[in-house]
Amino acid sequence: MASANRKNALFKVAALLEAMIILIMAVVFVGFIFIRGRNDAVTAAEEDPEVRTRPIIEKEETYYSLDGKKILMHDSTLGEVFVPVYSDVPVSDVDTEKIVTRNGYSFYMDGDTVKSKTGIDISEHQGEIDWGKVKGAGIDFAMIRAGYRTYGGGIVTIDENLSDNISSANAAGIDTGVYFFSQATTTDEAIEEADAVLDAISGCNVTYPVVYDWELIFDDSARTDDVSVETLADCCIAFCERVKSAGYTPMIYQNKTTAMHKLDLPRLKDYDFWLAEYGDEPTYYYKYDIWQYSSDGTVPGIEGRVDLNISFRDYGTGSPAPTSDEPA
């Protein structure tokens, strides 16, 4: 009888221990699931753009938001990405609410007066241009291609219609600037390009900037594929300083995405900037002086499509664009 009682007691202790072990295991398992769930939630909040950016999109209706030392940028190619904020690079002072579109052209307004200049950029590809009709359409300035370097062989070529376009545009009362499509990989090549441009426009009336247009080639392999951010900045500076030393206003042309990821903006902040960003209003964070807002414009006197631009400065006089009557 006593032996049976001892066995029963042992069974009860074993059962109690087993229950305690099961309870402990259950608590540990629940805790693990809870912690893992919290970690998953944090990961989702960090990696999922919808989770991270929803408050920004709903509350601010902007493509940019300051987050410490970074900007959240929405890009049509890259999606939503963080890019650095540079405290020493001037930010844009353009009030996008003052940009209006009339008859296919965009204007920067102050009440009922226009505070911008309307422009186009063209090359030999536009063929023969009736500059009188272009002026009659309300075009104030034209950025004319001076030339280009081939992205494969690296050959520098001057635009066939450069001189004729400058002189004919000037005769019609249109101010002119020029741009060079660069594929330079060294500062020596950038200086070579600048010298070619300066020689080509010698004796011409160029009052708008002389522009360095260095672009990435996406559809083919190019000699510039491995150009670093540092080397590109060196090339920009070499070209612009050469242009400045000749008495012209240097400028850098770039699209928003490449500007934010490929240009060393702190090193290039002192040069005027021509922004390419197509749409109803620009979203680029930093300062720009000319905005190319369309590659699909139509202008009387020019066959086919043409790029359209706003200049926030009147480079013809070296001052902010003067006011004029409200556009029709």
Regions found by a protein language model. Name each.
Residues M1, A41-T53:
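Intrinsically disordered, low-complexity cytosolic tails and juxtamembrane linkers
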Residues A2-L23:
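N-terminal Sec-pathway targeting helices
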Residues A26-E46:
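Sec-dependent signal peptide cleavage junction
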Residues V51-G119, P266-A328:
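Functionally critical loop-and-helix segments that line ligand-binding/catalytic clefts
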Residues L72-H74, D130, D159, D264:
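A diffuse structural propensity rather than consistent per-protein peaks
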Residues D112, S116-D234, A238, K244-A246:
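Substrate-binding cleft of extracellular glycoside hydrolase catalytic domains
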Residues A200, C204-V210, W214-E326:
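Surface-exposed substrate-engagement region within the catalytic domains
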